């Protein structure tokens, strides 16, 4: 899988705006927990969408630990570190950390530990001390605020991914594998149309495959 950085997506947004879907770059806000493989799949789709549509994704943190009232360290270290990255480097660097840590968690099957988080931070040129701080409650209030901002519009009976677009929000889409090229753009077009109707709540079928990381 070809990974995409913040520099790549800025270039992609410019390229997309000159193509057949010319127009102002649309902001999409995406809430994720680094441990969730389904959020990972959807995030890779959104980065592909940025290649073919005038879209820019801003990544935010929600917590499955908070949602499920769990204090499991494996559920907390990734989200705490992501908040630490946001506080230290700004919103736009969160995507780079997410790619680095998600690649390790989901493709590399690496453990959800301080050492794994440090390796992801090191890859991004970020302060490895964030990983140690992520074992504490230092950023928990900020994590809770980010979580609530993402989840309040969709409720507590869904998880991640959550996407906010055009003043509304939905859980999903849950996809496997993540579509590429114009297929990714077409799925986004449909998703955007669904979000435009305020009375839309749910469209679902049973999953027959797990996350396919291609």
Model regions and ranges:
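Conserved acidic functional residues
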Residues: 29, 33-35, 162-164
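Extreme N-terminus of proteins, especially the signal/transit-peptide cleavage junction
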Residues: 13-26
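Structural alpha/beta surface segment adjacent to cysteine/selenocysteine redox centers
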Residues: 31-34, 40-118, 190-194, 202-205, ...
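Short metal-coordination and nucleic-acid-contact micro-motifs, chiefly zinc-binding Cys/His arrays
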Residues: 24, 32, 159
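C-terminal cap of thioredoxin/glutaredoxin-like
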Residues: 114-214
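N-terminal acidic, proline/glycine-rich, low-complexity intrinsically disordered segments
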Residues: 1-14
